[in-house]
């Protein structure tokens, strides 16, 4: 067998091995969540009567939000908030304290490292119904 054929075969094997290793190390696809923070002080997810989010521990999450202006807003132009709190003690989860401006926005986040029940709350006084702007958020092991 000639030296060039050996080199080609070796190259093909190395390339196949690199592709296999790349697949094994590749990140799983992100969990995409599309929701609306609406003018009636409600979070809404298409197809769900009661909005609820379920993710896995440490999962990458792409949050696509359409925010519609309510009756009031912050001086910085934020019209709604999206903050994740632990349900058991109402402490905020780092990285999940978002201020929403009018229109469409996208956030790349990492799901909490602790499984359990959480709650999403609006942190901008958006209307008289602001206190009812919340939804369940579950993190699975």
Predicted ranges, named:
Residues 2-14:
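Bacterial N-terminal signal peptides that target proteins for export
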Residues 12-23:
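Bacterial N-terminal signal peptides
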Residues 25-141:
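Extracytoplasmic copper-binding redox domains, predominantly the cupredoxin/blue-copper superfamily
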């Amino acid at each position: 067998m000639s030296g060039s054929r050996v080199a080609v075969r070796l190259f093909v094997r190395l390339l196949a091995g690199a592709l296999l290793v790349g697949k094994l190390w590749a990140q799983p696809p992100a969990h995409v969540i599309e929701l609306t923070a609406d003018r009636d002080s409600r979070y809404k997810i298409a197809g769900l009567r009661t909005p609820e989010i379920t993710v896995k521990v440490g999962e990458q999450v792409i949050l696509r939000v359409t925010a519609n202006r309510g009756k009031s807003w912050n001086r910085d132009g934020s019209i709604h908030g999206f903050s994740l709190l632990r349900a058991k003690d109402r402490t905020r989860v780092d990285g999940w304290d978002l201020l929403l401006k009018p229109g469409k926005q996208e956030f790349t986040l990492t799901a909490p490292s602790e499984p359990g029940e959480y709650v999403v709350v609006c942190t901008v006084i958006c209307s008289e119904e602001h206190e009812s702007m919340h939804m369940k958020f579950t993190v699975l092991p």
